[in-house]
Structure formats: structure tokens, C-alpha cells
């Protein structure tokens, strides 16, 4: 029993809770030489932790984007022109207190009349469009490839090889989480009886003298859990969430017999089968919070004193619901990109991605269309902790569509994630990387933003880093509308800050220049200064 507990504790410590502008000459922009070569030692305050992504690397020794400094010293009272930003995601809470006044409105559509008033092929698309209709749960793409025999034999073999370990992992995880949950629950109930009270603190456990080996094991288990900073009821809730997560994978995401597309009613493998979905671009369930969190990072209302402030102002948010609880369909993404472009979006945020893409050419064609129409596409690099430059670590969509041999000259920008820890651990352990596959890094871990039903909370992922950079792009395009998408991308990359220390990726310590194309971290303050220079020629 003791050996099992030791194995459990080793496992649980990792996974239990894991689930009028001044001229540039008058300003002193941060430079690579300005950044500290030493990591930050002191802990962030609670206030700093909730808004670390807006703090300044020099003044605060945090790898934030200097958003506060940019507004204070550069933007000041300047008002740019409105910029439409499309959020291709899981839908946005259109009634959220920090987002409802920022929604893009289709001028040619009449809400709720059931007609396609502007004849664009989409009925009641007032604030965007819902390409998923009433669907929510969905298979992963490699599961669809196997179950529907998509693509050639080679693709099917690769997908099958990817599926088997995922199934094993999910089945094993369900059993492990159930065993852990049962152990913690029994230990919790036993110690409640021994102490004679429902709730207790870590100090109570430390004072208690165990009367047997079993009690010693119980104390050790509960002490380790509580030493991680949570009370036992919260830990049990997290364990139950883990059980639900992996059970859901087995029931839906990895289930060869599940058909999540049935409620939509279209053929997802026929790009010409149109007219599906509906005009309700909001989230459908409370747990469908991803798109709302992304939208808040990018553009939560800066003129109120409510929950959060977004990176950008003067933004009109276009909601395009295409990302289910599972992998998105290439058809939906391609059509959503074209919709965004045709309806006037100048920036598209894409906080999604997948390893397999049987109809990648549809998305690539849409990205070329966006490039031709001067639209910047900002994509999350992915959360697998992989080197995207290795051929086996594919991530879609990517910039393979580009006709230019120079990545800096296309309209695709890939963003990796930073943690709030300035120092060797500033690259998020989950973030993908690669000199070719990732352009730069931005804040993406422990990010506080909007959640459905006018709530707020912390989430992490490259999904959170992408909208931070998309917000930068929106600000530049708002203040300097004469700049092209390619120029905006180049400004964001060139104005980033180099970090004078090596950072950890797995077991390695590497320079940031080895992990992304620019070798830099995103910074709004320096980006606006450079945009001013490029726009004015000064």
C-alpha cells in the first residue's frame, strides 16, 4: 500500500491540480540591452498576477507587453479608426458586460427575421456566424480519418498510429483519477472522524499523532495535497473534473462511432455544400468559454472599470463559431476566413489548431484570399511542447500556403506562450516552438480574462498568446490604417524584445533565437513607436 501511495503522490503532484503621439526621439523605448539579465526573484502580488501581461519588462521585471506604458506614453488620448477583428473560435458571449458594446454589426442584416437580407449566403448574421449550428461535442481529426477512411492509405495509417496511444492514455487516466479520488475521499472522511470536525487546516494535520501505519499514510496523503495550496474538497472537485475530462474524450473525441456533425446537417467534406449553421454566434454552453476568454484578452472594454481591459481599443469583434469540443473541420475554418475577409475584418485571430488536416488546401486557399485582401491572420502555435520545425510535428493551419519564400513577407503570424516568470522559465512548458514554425512569444499562461455570463477567470495556452498579439495588430491598424498586413507583421516582429538569457525548453536551455523566427517577445509599446516611424517615414 505504501509503495502505491508513493507512486500516486509522485503522479499527483504533477497532475492533480493541473487540470497625439509624441515623436520617437522624445521617448525612451525599451531595448534588448535594457532588459535585466537576471531573473525576477520576488513573487508577483495578486494584483500584478491578474494583469501581468500588461506590465513592463523593464519597470516590473515581468515578460509583459508594456500595454499600460503604451497607453500612457504613446497612445494617450489619440483615437484611431475602428478595426474589425474576427474571432474564429467557439463563439463569444455576446451579452458579456465587457464585450457587448464592442460587437461588429452587419449593416446589411436585420436581426431575427430569418432572411438573408444582404444576400451574402448567411441568414441573420448580425454579429458573425455559427458554422456549428447546434453541435458541440466532436471527434478529433485523426479519429475522423480512421472512422471515415479519409485521404490515402498512408494518412490513415498515421492517424491510426496516433489514435491507439491516445485511447490507452485516456483509459488509463480515467482509472488512475478514479483510484486517486477514492483514496483522497476515504482519507478525508477518516481524518474528519479522527479530528471530530468537517473542515481542517494543514496545521491540524501536522499536530495530529497517527496511531497506526494506515493513519500515517492517510496523513501523508492529505498533507501532500494540502501543501500544494488547496483544501481537500477543492482537490476532490479537480479530480472529478479530470475523470470527466477523460471520460468525455472516450465518449466523444476518441470514439470511432460518434457523429458530432449530425445536428449540423451538411456534408463537411463538400466545400460547396453551403447554407448550414445559423446566425447565433454566441457560445452555446457555459463550458464553451474559450472564445469569450480570447475576445477579452484582445479587446475587453477599456473605457469601463469592470473586470479586465483588453490590449486594443477601437475594435469591433466579429464572432465566428467554428471550434467544437474536439477538432474543427477544415471546411468551417476556410469558410469562416472568407466570411471574415468579405465582411471587412482586417485582423483574424485563430486560437485553434490540429495535427491532421485532410482538406488543408481549402484553408490554404482561404489564407491566400485573406493575403490578397490585406488581412493579417494570427495563429496560436499550439500546446504540445513540440518543435514545429520537425516534420513529424505538423500543426494546422500553417503558412505553407504562402507564395513568398520569406516568412516575414506573408500575412500569417504564429505565436508561442510566455509565463509570468521573467527568467529561464519564461517559455510556457506547454508551448510549441520552432525557428520556422513560431514567429515570436507573447503572454499566454495564467491570463485573467472574460468568461461567459459576465464572469472572469484565469486560463492558459497559446490560445491566450495569439489574441494578445492580434490586439497589438488591431491597435497598429487602428492608429495607422495606411499600413499593410505584411507591414504590421514586420513591425510586430522587428519591435519585439530580445531576452539576454537562455530559457528552458524541456531538458534544454536555449537562446530565444533558437525557439522562434524573430527571437523576441512581443511588446506593444515598442511596436507603436516603430509603427509611427514606418507610417511617417521619420
Residue positions per predicted region:
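C-terminal motif of bacterial Sec signal peptides marking the signal peptidase cleavage site
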Residues: 17-20
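Bacterial lipoprotein signal-peptidase II cleavage site
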Residues: 22-28
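C-terminal subdomain of the subtilisin-like protease fold in secreted/lumenal serine endopeptidases
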Residues: 25, 341-343, 347-350, 410-414, ...
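Short acidic, glycine-rich surface-loop motifs adjacent to enzyme active sites
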Residues: 41-51, 57, 157-185, 189-192, ...
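Mature extracellular/periplasmic domains of secretome proteins
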Residues: 71-79, 286-288, 309-312, 327-349, ...
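Subtilisin-like serine protease catalytic core
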Residues: 71-85, 92-329, 407-412, 433-437, ...
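Active-site glycine-centered loops adjacent to acidic/histidine catalytic or metal-binding residues
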Residues: 89, 382, 461
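Extracellular S/T/G-rich loop segment that most often corresponds to the catalytic His/Ser-adjacent loop
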Residues: 375, 395, 399-478, 482, ...
